[in-house]
Amino acid sequence: DLAVVAGQCACEAAGITPQSVDAILVSTTSPDSAFPSTACHVQRALGANPVMAFDLSASCSGFLYGVSMADVMIRSGQVRSCLVIAAEVKSRSLDARDRETAMLFGDGAGAVLVVQEVSAHPDAPGILGVRLYADGSGHGLITIPAGGSRKPVGVDTVRASEHMLRMQGRAVFRSAVRRLEQAMIDVLKE
């Protein structure tokens, strides 16, 4: 529901109706259900036309991944506009006893409409630069151990609180700062 409200607000702010959107991309790691996608739920709730609608799971960087993907889809001519939404409901996967982690996460959503500038020169730059990195070697630094197909939620996993978010905060912070610094340097070099 947060994603729907964010999408409505973005469309209203842009002065367009959801029916004129060419694509809907939702970044979330806390979908209401495994499927259909949250983007399809948003599409239906907004009354949007049957257009490209899909989810992206990239956690904290998901919104940036979404905007970058929207830019690529527009530049390739696939779409003229893309509603990009990032929505998370982390409160349901937080262990209140883990104060170091629980205080860092919450629930929220934001959205932006990325559009092709009609009057722009064909070589207009659009988004000037993006550098996105993922580091799979840090897989265990922030995780929800149970709930996927590898380890479905069951009595034992619930007793062990394995359906709750776990994070090694200091290690995540160090990695994020290092990657953010490198991304900024790389973008500025362009």
Question: Residue spans of the language-model regions?
Answer:
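Buried hydrophobic positions in well-ordered alpha/beta secondary-structure cores of metabolic enzymes
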Residues: 10, 21-24, 42, 66, ...
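Flexible, glycine-rich active-site loops centered on histidine and acidic residues
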Residues: 75-109
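Conserved catalytic cysteine-centered active-site region
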Residues: 1, 28-82, 121
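Short beta-strand segments
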Residues: 27, 57, 82-88, 106, ...
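Phosphate/pyrophosphate-binding loops at sites that engage ATP/ADP/AMP, CoA/4′-phosphopantetheine
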Residues: 6-22, 183-190
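Structural motif
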Residues: 22-23, 80-83, 110-112, 125-126
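Condensing-enzyme catalytic core mediating Claisen C-C bond formation in acyl metabolism
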Residues: 1, 98-174, 178, 182-185
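Short, well-ordered, mixed-charge alpha-helical segments that flank or form enzyme active sites
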Residues: 32-35, 62-65, 90-95, 136-139
